Amino acid sequence: MFVKLLRSVAIGLIVGAILLAAMPSLRKINTLTAPQFDSADETPASYNPAVRRAAPAVVNVYNRSMNSTAHNQLEIRTLGSGVIMDQRGYIITNKHVINDADQIIVALQDGRVFEALLVGSDTLTDLAVLKINATGGLPTIPINNKRVPHIGDVVLAIGNPYNLGQTITQGIISATGRIGLNPTGRQNFLQTDASINHGNSGGALVNSLGELMGINTLSFDKSNDGETPEGIGFAI
């Protein structure tokens, strides 16, 4: 009986040695190292701090034009959003938001309303710069030029969709350097699945720290087969 036991133990040791030789991975337990994230990649319990940093600097932009059939009254032709870039009142928006405007109105989140001056625009990038004369200080968007957007980064789209009022949607950067969207214009878009709708154009796309990543520009309304795509928006 004792001999049989020794024989079984010996066989077990031999089999174990063969397995260790054939499969080195069994010699030790592999440990997984947790990936290191920077502060912009960490997932917070709430994005409210980022919203509070960025949202006050995102404004509503109204393109008003003369209606000759209504006794030349100014009426809202298109609407969009804009981003206050500095304390002097310079605002960036999309050119298509203010095209052919007879008057441009900017509404701040604190209730102040201003008539804006068009400083300049660029068809290639679909960007325009507005200027308002405001007293009492202006909120400005946080900017970090060292922060490079990466695929998978959490982003927030801030704007005024359908004139509902300021709205925040959340998603990730789905792609960078997207091309082929505008044959005559800029060919380097950020793609995101954060909801971007009519009225979001010119608004801010910010990271989880509230820092400006891009200017919301367009979304797919319909695909070539007539379907309405979801979760496909673009920012400059």
Residue spans of the language-model regions?
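Serine-dependent protease modules
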Residues: V3-G12, G16, L20-I236
